[in-house]
Design a protein with these regions (language model features):
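Extreme N-terminal starter segment of soluble prokaryotic enzymes
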Residues: 1-4
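Acetyl-CoA-dependent GNAT
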Residues: 6-89, 100-102, 106, 138-143, ...
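Flexible, glycine- and charge-enriched loops at secondary-structure boundaries
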Residues: 35, 93, 148
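Glycine-centered loop/turn positions within well-structured domains
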Residues: 79, 93, 153
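C-terminal "cap" of GNAT-fold acetyltransferases
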Residues: 113-116, 120-127, 131-162
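Short, flexible hinge/linker loops that cap or flank conserved catalytic cores
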Residues: 78, 109, 147-149
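Conserved glycine-rich acetyl-CoA-binding loop
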Residues: 64, 83, 87-101, 105-110, ...
């Protein structure tokens, strides 16, 4: 059984380990690289968890971290779904669905009416997951990637209270 756990600042080693696993297993899925996170030590890992109003979740299977997702307050816009990843062993079992739903619940409780994300345009499995959850591509230009040409695909979902 998979359990979801909200990550606190004291859980920074857990967050570090799952983030490193995600970047090592799926470097094609993230804008940052594993090497980017080797600098800064504990202070850098804690800084990500100390963002005011942020919400970070880890999926645990038999006590092992097998997935992660985060919600970050928007900078003048809707909050953002960030850093979604599920380990290969846990894929296809609804872990990604549960992580996304948990961030959506967090956003609704914070009063948001929409949730935004940015995904690398070649990440077809992630795009399909997000579309299944009701996210749609926008015309908003995403951040420019390292190649200086490609931009992230920005997607948004209208949130409704049930």
């Amino acid at each position: 059984m998979v359990d979801l756990r909200v990550v606190t600042m004291d859980d920074w080693p857990l967050w570090r380990d799952i983030r490193r696993a995600a970047l090592a297993e799926a470097p094609h899925a993230f804008k940052s690289r594993l090497a980017d996170w080797h600098r800064g030590g504990e202070k850098r890992w804690r800084a990500r968890l100390e963002v005011p109003g942020a919400h970070h979740i880890v999926a645990l299977l038999d006590g092992r971290a097998v997935g992660m997702a985060g919600g970050l307050p928007g900078d003048g816009g809707p909050p953002e779904l960030r850093s979604v990843w599920v380990s290969p062993e846990a894929r296809g079992h609804g872990v990604g669905d549960r992580l996304i739903a948990a961030v959506e619940t967090w956003a609704l409780r914070a009063g948001a009416t929409a949730l935004r994300l940015a995904v690398l345009p070649g990440n077809a499995p992630a795009i399909a997951l997000y579309e299944r959850h009701g996210f749609v591509a926008t015309r908003e230009p995403g951040d420019l990637l390292a190649d200086g040409v490609t931009r992230e695909l920005v997607m948004v979902k209208a949130l409704r209270r049930s």
